[in-house]
A protein has these predicted regions:
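Kelch-like beta-propeller repeat domains
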Residues: 1-294
């Protein structure tokens, strides 16, 4: 199984990187590219490698190219799982590894803040810019026209952000804007974003309540001892701010979100306790009123 980010372009489905097992059975981040052709029902691994590992990243399409940003640092992530493998069943060693892994400042994880572009016609990667702030992992992404929004995500393992970034491709130069925060103060990761009748939607996600305060008070292992909470909130962007405008029937995170019939379709995911869910949810907006169909 590969946890990854996908993009549809030229009638094909592209899978960029992801997390899986290597030939030795170790969990690791990949930087390869696979293409699926629905007409022939066939997969092919392309002779293309991103300049960095890709996991927890987001992907969107603009003007014929796929864009990738965010995600964990490949060396740090892979090193963590290599250390755990070396520790085996030694609980003392495992506790030490976890403490060292989580007890760092956000900037010391080197989450990807570069924007990369992938051209399907040449299968080449290019530098397309970088965030003036910081990289995130597990953000929600949605785009319309020349604008793309990156919503929340992890700022470091266990610590979310409530930030919302806007990428504006209007004109010749890409502009990065920071919008009003949402799901404050702790933020969530693995949420869902979409657009319905021109209304920007953000729903669900999971985080650790109190982690932001812990981090601001100098506790780098900010989520230590905290229980993961699963959000049911549905927020709408309206008049320059976010309004809580509805609720999901249960907290949900890490599923698939798609535009469908001018609505946001959420498929599967995870709910409280890490339990997998197999149903779907359709979120529609009309006159700033949210309708949820299960």
């Amino acid at each position: 199984m590969r946890l990854d980010s996908k993009s549809v372009r030229d009638g094909n489905l592209y899978v960029f990187g992801g997390i899986g097992k290597n030939s030795e059975g170790l969990t690791q981040v990949f930087n390869d590219v696979h293409k699926y052709n629905p007409k022939t029902n066939s997969w092919v691994k392309l002779m293309s490698h991103a300049p960095m590992g890709m996991a927890g990243h987001v992907t969107f399409v603009h003007n014929g190219k796929a864009y990738v940003t965010g995600g964990v640092n490949q060396n740090i992530f892979n090193g963590y799982f290599e250390d755990l493998n070396e520790a085996g069943k030694d609980s003392t060693a495992i506790d030490k590894i976890n403490a060292h892994y989580f007890d760092k400042k956000a900037e010391d994880y080197f989450f990807n803040k570069f924007l990369l572009s992938f051209d399907p016609s040449t299968q080449q990667w290019s530098y397309a810019g970088e965030s003036p702030w910081y990289g995130t992992a597990g953000a929600a992404v949605v785009n319309k026209g020349d604008k793309t929004w990156l919503i929340n995500g992890e700022a470091k393992p266990g610590l979310r952000t409530d930030a919302v970034f806007e990428l504006d491709f209007t004109g010749d130069n890409l502009k990065w804007n920071k919008l009003a925060p949402v799901a404050s103060p702790d933020g969530v990761a693995g949420g869902f974003a979409g657009i319905s009748n021109d209304s920007l939607i953000f729903a669900g996600g999971a985080g650790f309540k109190g982690s932001r305060e812990n981090y601001q008070n100098g506790k780098n292992y900010a989520h230590e001892g905290l229980k993961k909470s699963y959000s049911t909130d549905i927020h709408l962007w309206h008049n320059g701010k976010w309004d809580k405008s509805g609720e999901l029937s249960q907290g949900r995170v890490y599923g698939v979100s798609l535009p469908w019939n001018n609505s946001l379709l959420i498929i599967g995911g995870e709910t409280a306790g890490g339990k997998a869910v197999t149903d779907s949810v359709l979120i529609s907006v009309k006159d700033n009123k949210v309708t949820v169909q299960n």
